[in-house]
């Protein structure tokens, strides 16, 4: 396995030297724009040569709407994986077939109604062989119904809600750590760093994902003896958090946990800083791990958040050996270098998740030795390996089929280095941290 994957990685690295300058190199989609790797509504590759099999991957991306920041980066990661595999000659099957990929994708406009319409089109008109989910749990719930209805295996990324995997689906597989575990580590971090702290406020966006996270956190924190002094939701699209902040001030928590997505989380953090509320810990979903969160300046200092992946996370071939797992794919260093070369920006965990979704599908196809949907499903059911994104393993029980059981979160916090520059540090778990948590926040 190690030797085979070394060859795989070498091919990928060599291909990047050419693809970074090629006309087909991926470009970050902008609002309303198209990715060079996957033009909206069109194929991303020419007709297959002799001995090649062209496989169609279908998905939607929120090029417009409130989810565009996270979704575009997820799409960038997926397109990078696809271009690398194709440039390296495809996935080689035992019978000599080289499997290459083309994509069909559409702008879902961050709309669940559009997702159902477009995934139906992907399954019935575009004849996609495999599906990748849109970004967000709400949109993925809409896509999952279609994937199951038309028996199309779908890798979900950017979709952490547990509830999507308790619907009896058998072809939907989650790359992310489930929402129920998104913020529970924050309670553990606080307990370890500030054992006398007891009062926590939970403020969350009223969407499927954020509500699942908040509800699971409330139960977990209460079980650890914390007093939840405020449990409050806010509407998606909220831009004025003054009424919420007033309630937080009245409740006088020592720590504030919650949030939702990038736009609301960034705005909430900025307005909290402007009000100067005294907090020992401020832990928000989704927004803090994004590199662009640093644009908040001093308002970003001390803000922490769970991340599905960070470049510093120690997922390596050596770690796989130590854990008794097989290692698959490129290293985090190789992924980061490739992404930065292609998009001229640091990859966020959303970008890593998009790439990981492709890598999971690739591993399943290789293990199955086929692109037959049932064979790939069987391979996904038995997958248990470590890649640059983390441990990948799926629940195969009828009650939660496809739920991710291997992957774990890391927690980042924005701090200032000795030169006064904002930097992200891993502050939890203890075995992965690069710095102690900065507390109090204000």
Please name every model-derived segment.
Residues 1-56, 149, 441-442:
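Short, low-complexity disordered leader/linker segments with a strong preference
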Residues 69-76, 91-166, 175, 234-241, ...:
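Beta-alpha junction/loop-to-helix N-cap segments that form part of ligand/metal-binding clefts
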Residues 70-94, 215-223:
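Short, polar/charged alpha-helical segment
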Residues 76, 128-231, 280-314:
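Extracytoplasmic ligand/sensor domains, especially the bilobed periplasmic-binding protein
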Residues 338-351, 362-424:
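Segments of small-molecule ligand-sensing domains
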């Amino acid at each position: 396995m190690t030797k085979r994957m070394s060859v795989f990685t070498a091919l990928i690295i060599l291909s990047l030297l050419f693809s970074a300058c090629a006309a087909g190199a991926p470009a970050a989609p902008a609002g309303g724009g198209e990715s060079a790797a996957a033009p909206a509504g069109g194929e991303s590759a020419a007709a297959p040569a002799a001995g090649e099999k062209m496989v169609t991957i279908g998905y939607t991306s929120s090029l417009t709407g409130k989810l565009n920041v996270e979704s575009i980066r997820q799409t960038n990661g997926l397109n990078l994986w696809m271009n690398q595999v194709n440039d390296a000659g495809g996935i080689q099957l035992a019978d000599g077939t080289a499997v290459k990929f083309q994509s069909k994708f559409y702008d879902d406009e961050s709309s669940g109604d559009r997702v159902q319409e477009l995934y139906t089109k992907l399954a019935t008109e575009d004849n996609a062989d495999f599906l990748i989910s849109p970004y967000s749990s709400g949109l993925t719930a809409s896509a999952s119904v279609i994937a199951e209805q038309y028996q199309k295996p779908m890798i979900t990324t950017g979709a952490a809600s547990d509830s999507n995997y308790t619907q009896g689906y058998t072809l939907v597989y989650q790359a992310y750590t489930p929402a129920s575990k998104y913020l529970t580590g924050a309670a553990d971090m606080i307990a370890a760093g500030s054992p006398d702290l007891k009062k926590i406020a939970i403020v969350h966006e009223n969407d499927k994902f954020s509500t699942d996270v908040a509800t699971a956190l409330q139960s977990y924190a209460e079980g650890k003896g914390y007093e939840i002094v405020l449990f409050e939701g806010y509407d998606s699209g909220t831009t004025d958090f003054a009424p919420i902040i007033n309630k937080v001030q009245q409740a006088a928590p020592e720590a504030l946990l919650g949030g939702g997505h990038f736009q609301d989380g960034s705005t909430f953090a900025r307005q909290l800083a402007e009000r100067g509320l005294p907090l020992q810990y401020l832990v928000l979903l989704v927004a803090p791990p994004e590199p662009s969160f640093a644009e908040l300046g001093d308002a970003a200092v001390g803000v922490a958040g769970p991340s599905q992946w960070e470049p510093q996370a120690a997922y390596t071939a050596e770690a796989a050996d130590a854990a008794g797992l097989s290692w698959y794919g490129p290293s985090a260093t190789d992924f980061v270098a490739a992404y930065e070369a292609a998009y001229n920006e640091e990859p966020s965990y959303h970008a890593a998740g998009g790439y990981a979704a492709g890598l999971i599908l690739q591993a399943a196809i290789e293990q199955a030795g086929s692109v037959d949907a049932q064979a790939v499903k069987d391979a996904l059911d038995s997958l248990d390996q470590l890649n640059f994104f983390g441990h990948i393993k799926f629940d195969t029980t009828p009650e939660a089929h496809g739920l991710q059981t291997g992957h774990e979160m890391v927690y980042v916090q924005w701090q200032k280095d000795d030169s006064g520059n904002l930097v992200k540090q891993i502050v939890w778990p203890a075995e992965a941290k690069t710095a102690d948590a900065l507390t109090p926040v204000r």
